[in-house]
Design a protein with these regions (language model features):
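C-terminal-biased regions
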Residues: 23-34, 52-183
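Sec-dependent N-terminal signal peptides
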Residues: 4-13
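Boundary at the C-terminal end of the N-terminal hydrophobic targeting segment
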Residues: 16-22
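Short helix-adjacent coil turns
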Residues: 35-47
Length: 183
């Protein structure tokens, strides 16, 4: 009887906790991320708003950034509130599943803090990854969901800061679930 209960528990828990991205899911994420990038390039706030999970919270202080798509569209048009800087520069290929990270792109030469550089990375994160606690803690997302995280880092000799865009695939739709900015 104990063996049967153990096996049932094992089968049940595997079903609950095994929601990892398949290769097909990863390609779908990259396809939709590419569509998001096209909407960014065209400054199509209506299309962009469909990729945001509302209410979107700031991962730093857990305050709501946008309650709904109207808030998003209003902020998108205001350059002071623009949070998608450089997100469209990450190169993704949804057919091959390839992500080409941007490494040490020179943004400004000889500024106050020296040369200013940017790096952009995209990666898939599962709850078993070493850095998973940071992303799951910041986003408040269940560890049952795999994440697609895009990081935009800008740095020079005196300052560095990063923005983290945390996405999930929900109902086969890519959704930005948290935005986190560190100095």
């Amino acid at each position: 009887m104990r063996k049967i209960l153990f096996l049932l528990l094992l089968v049940f828990s595997t079903g609950i906790y095994s929601k990892s991205f398949t290769e097909t899911d990863k390609k779908e994420v990259l396809k939709q991320f590419s569509e998001l990038q096209n909407a960014l390039k065209k400054k199509n706030s209506n299309a962009l708003s469909t990729y945001v999970s509302y209410p979107l919270k700031d991962g730093n202080i857990k305050t709501v950034i946008w309650k709904n798509s109207s808030d998003f569209i209003k902020d998108f048009k205001d350059p002071e509130n623009y949070v998608f800087s450089h997100l469209d520069e990450l190169r993704v290929n949804s057919v091959s599943g390839q992500i080409d990270n941007v490494e040490e792109k020179l943004l400004e030469r000889g500024g106050e803090g020296g040369d200013k550089f940017m790096e952009i990375t995209g990666k898939f994160i599962t709850s078993s990854d070493d850095e998973a606690e940071f992303y799951y803690g910041a986003s408040g997302i269940s560890k049952n969901d795999d994440l697609f995280v895009v990081t935009v880092s800008v740095y020079d000799d005196m300052f560095d800061g990063s923005s983290y865009y945390i996405f999930i695939l929900s109902g086969n739709k890519l959704k930005l679930v948290s935005y986190l900015q560190l100095p």
